[in-house]
């Protein structure tokens, strides 16, 4: 039974799914050349959960007087900003990321936003994942919609000889909504490639000719697909190695990026990886009163900076 048929019959799919939002044609085509199986380019998305204070991370130095008026209790001291350009600087704990910038390996895109911003963490995350406008609600992710244009029959008959590896991998316990398609998520969740166990297929004898039997068959096929992807992930993990010695054991994000680096080095053909760093909903703990360049936000930015540099 095809997954599309199952979804149509399932009571959980009574709400229609829309494919609106940002059109694929509106996105620079070269951005998606990484999905070409003949290319060795890989897209790694790092999602900062909780609402990162971008103005204290990437600081517009030419607007410092205005920032001082708007946020005097949390603004970074002007003399501690790490200069990138004449008008732009980084938080002082992000020296590693500045080194990446100075080496010509970091580009910055500013003013990425949308009209009528929503101040809710939850709704803003939905908009980020789906690339919807502030006035529409979508149930498909922006990467999922694009992947669906290329592989509309997924997950039926996947993996196969042409595409033996997952299209996307989310490092964590749950797949990323960014990769959600109409009837399937194109991402595979992975916690630890060193500790993968095959899932038991829930079939014992013939299945009844009923909706229940169809659902069990669908579940079984999903588990078979997961086990097949896990096999390819384990193979790449066993072959991979990490040249960098900068991955700190006490850095959560670095450990996730280390997994990504190892799978890439091991030859896994997955083109998209999603990793997340949480804790950015800092509120009063964002900065220390006696030194605004320290505090919870500074700790997270340091973790982000050192992890990216190691990767």
Model features per residue range: what roles?
Residues 2-306, 310:
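Feature for exported/extracytoplasmic and membrane-associated proteins, marking the mature portion
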């Amino acid at each position: 039974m095809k997954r599309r048929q199952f979804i149509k019959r399932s009571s959980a799919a009574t709400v229609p799914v829309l494919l609106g939002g940002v059109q694929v044609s509106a996105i620079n085509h070269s951005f998606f050349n990484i999905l070409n199986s003949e290319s060795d380019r890989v897209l790694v998305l790092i999602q900062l959960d909780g609402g990162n204070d971008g103005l204290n991370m990437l600081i517009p130095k030419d607007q410092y007087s205005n920032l001082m008026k708007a946020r005097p209790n949390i603004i970074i001291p002007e003399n501690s900003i790490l200069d990138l350009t004449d008008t732009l600087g980084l938080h002082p704990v992000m020296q590693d990321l500045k080194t990446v910038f100075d080496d010509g390996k970091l580009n910055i895109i500013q003013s990425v936003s949308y009209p009528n911003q929503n101040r809710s963490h939850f709704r803003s995350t939905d908009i980020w994942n789906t690339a919807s406008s502030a006035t529409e609600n979508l149930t498909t992710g922006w990467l999922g919609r694009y992947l669906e244009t290329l592989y509309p029959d997924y997950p039926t008959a996947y993996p196969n000889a042409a595409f033996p590896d997952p299209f996307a991998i989310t490092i964590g316990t749950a797949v990323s909504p960014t990769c959600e398609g109409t009837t399937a998520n194109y991402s595979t969740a992975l916690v630890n490639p060193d500790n993968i166990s095959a899932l038991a297929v829930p079939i014992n004898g013939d299945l009844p000719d009923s909706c229940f039997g169809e659902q069990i068959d669908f579940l079984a096929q999903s588990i078979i697909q997961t086990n097949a992807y896990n096999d390819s992930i384990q193979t790449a993990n066993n072959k991979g190695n990490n040249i960098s010695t900068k991955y700190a054991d006490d850095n959560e994000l670095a450990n996730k990026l280390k997994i990504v680096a190892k799978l890439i080095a091991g030859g896994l053909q997955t083109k998209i990886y999603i990793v997340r760093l949480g804790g950015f909903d800092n509120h009063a703990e964002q900065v220390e009163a006696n030194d605004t360049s320290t505090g919870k936000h500074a700790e997270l930015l340091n973790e982000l900076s050192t992890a990216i540099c190691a990767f």
